[in-house]
Amino acid sequence: MRPAQASIDLEALRHNYRLAKRLGGSKALAVVKADAYGHGAVPCAQALEPEADGFAVACIEEALELRQAGIRAPILLLEGFFEHDELRLIAEHDLWTVAATPQQVRALAAFQSPRPLRVWLKMDSGMHRLGLSPEDFRAAWLRLRGLPQIASLVLMTHLARADELDCSRTDEQAVAFALTAGGMRAETSLRNSPGLLGWPALRNDWSRPGLMLYGANPFPQDTENTAQLRPVMTLRSRIILVRDLPVGEPVGYGARFVAERPTRVGVVAMGYADGYPQFAPNGTPVLVDGQVCPLIGRVSMDMLTVDLTDHPQADIGATVQLWGQAPRVGPLATQCNVSAYQLLCGLKRLPRTYVGSAAVGEVAAR
């Protein structure tokens, strides 16, 4: 079997969820969209369900996958519904839905639901993606609040620049949301991962932690709060070949690395098709049997190469750790000019092993 794999620590996942609850002082929906940011939505939801207040996903397909796996906790559709027919599935499977467009509000007002629906009404406070204008937001609340098919309303918005701790935009959004939602008797939801980790003055009834659940830092630098996060995913493989190169010999496509000294090269079974960033620069650190070694040469589809010259004990079969407790995925993403979100969600073909939960079992694969 090819040795590349992702190990998922479910106890670290639970720790990060508890941290989100503690920082928020509120209920929290665990965001498990995009296959739990590449960690496996079903195993992660199963591990969190005994203590989670609920879950959030992007769309109904992701919600139904959780329901079919036996998840009974509340599940919120963050993008709401795309077709009117989905409303019957939402009611049938006891899902919660966001209403973020005038079309969704009209559809909810006209829907004869077999059971009252819990709706999260979304205001655009400055993200300018999904969300109702302040005027439409107030009108939608007035229109929906007394309808028999609406069980309750939660008022929400989404922070656009909370990962920039010196940016005033977050406070401006919070004020705009408070001014519009003031006087509306309903629970509120404002804080995402950076909002929880970096903006303690913000308050809401429901938080929506996503990236932080998986132990990744949304900020360029560590803070007192982000230092408490535990990485959930460890990306590992092994050395599959070792060769010695003389001075002047290149490594990999495009000869991006040329040996300036006699160089001992280790070939690792891990490439960009596995989700490792293709444009990771020379010198990017990896751990080989616990010792830091630099990446050399361009990352290929299925392989990458590291400099073992200063680690003479390393040989074929040595364990290579690409990210996890060290190196962390956040600094790696910054070094490669991508986001941690993109790296974590990009692991499409790797098998995953799970530790830290008797409910799920020790090993599960994609």
UniProtKB/Swiss-Prot annotation:
Molecular functions per Gene Ontology: alanine racemase activity; pyridoxal phosphate binding
SMART domains, alphabetized: Ala_racemase_C
Keyword ATP-binding listed: no
Residues bearing PTM N6-(pyridoxal phosphate)lysine: 33
Catalytic machinery residues: 33 (proton acceptor), 253 (proton acceptor)
Residues that hold substrate according to the record: 129, 301
Pathway it works in: Amino-acid biosynthesis; D-alanine biosynthesis; D-alanine from L-alanine: step 1/1
Catalyzed reaction equations: L-alanine = D-alanine
Name used for this protein in its record: Alanine racemase
Gene: alr
